[in-house]
């Protein structure tokens, strides 16, 4: 049966995902940045209270995936922490300035991760050649690759995703970016073994007093009074589609 991974940005979201049938959680912070390394407090709380597999993301900042030596050193320290806390896997990715997988750094990541399953995240979609990148990641021992098929969303990139799956002896290809209940069946029919979804909604903040003339974000258009939350009904609907597909 296809596996459903839900991207969660809080303890509350992780609990919602678990209750509604998620098979695995990608744990992140900072949804507006596309996901950054969670805090120690969140990591420990989730490790203590969530029973399904949780893979934290290791990403020190937003933007591209070419990191300074200092940033990369911090990533290795975060990987060691995630390993010490007992998580079964992690999610990360590093590139060279030319858009190739940074194999030298991936070797260090894999060594730091040890027995943990490593997912190479959507840095893959920024690679110059996805097929060369997939071969390199297979050589590195990466367990899976999260990809939209190098398109804005996985529905647009489905043909490339199918080509990547056809490569055979390679990491698991997990489709992600815009995967929802209304298009999930297309991925299942295409033979995708794992899907990744935020299954989320933005909710208004409960704050009554609001200083509308001030933003805490560098993006002055950012809505300071909305919060991301995993929608349990969406997770349950997607899991139901997967179960019914398996029963065919």
Curated annotation (Swiss-Prot):
The protein here is known as PF03932 family protein CutC
Q: Which family does it belong to?
A: Belongs to the CutC family.
Q: Cite the NCBIfam families for this sequence.
A: PRK11572.1
Could you tell me the superkingdom of the organism this chain comes from?
A: Bacteria
Report whether ATP-binding shows up as a keyword of the record: no
- Please name the InterPro entries in this protein's record: CutC-like, CutC-like_dom_sf
Q: Could you list the residue ranges that cross the membrane?
A: none
The protein's location, in the record's own words, is: Cytoplasm
Keywords attached to this entry: Cytoplasm
Quick one: which gene encodes this?
A: cutC
GO molecular function terms listed in the Swiss-Prot or TrEMBL record: copper ion binding
Record text on subunit structure and interactions? Homodimer.
One cellular component (GO) term of this entry: cytoplasm
Q: Which Pfam families match?
A: CutC
- For whether the record's keyword set contains Protein biosynthesis, the answer is no
Instruction: State the organism of origin.
Output: Salmonella heidelberg (strain SL476)
């Amino acid at each position: 049966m296809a596996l459903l991974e839900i991207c969660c940005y809080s303890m509350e979201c992780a609990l919602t995902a678990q209750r509604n049938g998620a098979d695995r959680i990608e744990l992140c912070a900072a949804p507006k940045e596309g996901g950054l390394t969670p805090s120690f407090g969140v990591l420990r709380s989730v490790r203590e209270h969530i029973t399904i597999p949780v893979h934290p993301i290791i990403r020190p900042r937003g933007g591209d995936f070419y990191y300074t030596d200092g940033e990369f050193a911090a990533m290795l320290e975060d990987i060691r922490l995630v390993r010490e806390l007992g998580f079964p896997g992690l999610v990360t990715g590093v590139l060279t300035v030319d858009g190739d997988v940074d194999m030298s750094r991936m070797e260090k990541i894999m060594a730091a991760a040890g027995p943990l399953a490593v997912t190479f995240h959507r840095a893959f979609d920024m690679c110059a050649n996805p097929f060369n990148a997939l071969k390199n990641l297979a050589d590195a021992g990466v367990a899976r690759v999260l990809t939209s098929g190098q398109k804005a969303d996985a529905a647009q990139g489905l043909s490339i995703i199918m080509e990547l799956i056809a490569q055979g002896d390679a990491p698991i290809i997990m489709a992600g970016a815009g995967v929802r209940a209304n298009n999930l069946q297309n991925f299942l029919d295409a033979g995708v073994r794992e899907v990744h979804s935020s299954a989320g909604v933005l909710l208004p903040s409960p704050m009554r007093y609001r200083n509308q003339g001030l933003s805490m974000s560098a993006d002055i258009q950012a809505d300071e009074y909305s919060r991301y939350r995993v929608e349990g009904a969406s997770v349950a609907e997607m899991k139901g589609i997967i179960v019914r597909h398996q029963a065919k």
